[in-house]
Amino acid sequence: MEHPKQPKRESLKTLWREKRAVTLVYIFLRTSVLLVLLAQIFNRNFENVFLCVLTLILFTMPSLLERKLDIDLPNTLEIIILLFIYAAEILGEIGAYYVTFPNWDTVLHTMNGFLCAAIGFSLLDILNRNSRVRFHLSPLYLAIVAFCFSMTVGVLWEFFECAMDQFFFFDMQKDTIVHDIGTILLDPTGGNHPVVLRNITDVIVVQADGTKTALGLGGYLDIGLMDTMEDLFVNFIGALVFSIIGYFYVLSRGKGKFVKRFIPVANDTVSQENTTSGEETSL
């Protein structure tokens, strides 16, 4: 008598063998998020409840992309993506790591630039290896497009942060205290000549009802410009680093072991590589 469920069992065993590290990390992070979710429900902090639910949804994205695009994500890349989501949403927002650790946001944006360049690079590399696609990009163009893809994602994210700040006052674009500013709005002639104010030590806010409040911050409050520029710059660094690494990876015909940990491949390519290695072993 045949057992129709046997192939499924075998496939689960294979999946566990190949994705053991990813599965363990996923279970640990998901359990942690669920515990945080219960705590936030108990505290009636529904904004954080939403962040927890969003995190759980984002955790499913890597496996969803693998199924929909018929690709295989390297374990290292998948684990980093999961840790990145957890670090940004749970630790950063709910755990207030953005405030506790001043460079937390900078590190995440650098990782974002690196990861997005890897994803953009891999998508083009998959198309390059597909015989049904009628164009073929050189290694240099692959690197340039991957870099541009990563920077575009970074810019779109800054648009999102700005929208959240404007409409919901989330303060996602973190503030910076500056001591010198230059602005044409203070030009007494109404011209285009910037007036420079130096050594600012405090700012007094006057509200519509006449209430005056000295902020006592020790300088002028910049409400996001410096943070946005820093985020885009470190995104640029991350994207540039991976684009250079990816360029040499393609030149060497995919022999770099380090880069392979970050570049998804089409499943038919994986099958071909496994078949080839099997033939070499038998010989």
Language model regions located:
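Membrane-interface helix caps and helix-loop-helix hairpins in membrane proteins
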Residues: 41-46, 68-71, 94-104
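Short, Lys/Arg-rich, polar N-terminal cytosolic tail immediately upstream
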Residues: 1-19
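Cytoplasmic-side transmembrane-helix entry/capping segments in multi-pass membrane proteins
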Residues: 53, 72-83, 106-109
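Interfacial helix-loop-helix junctions of multi-pass membrane proteins
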Residues: 94-105, 154-155, 159-242, 247
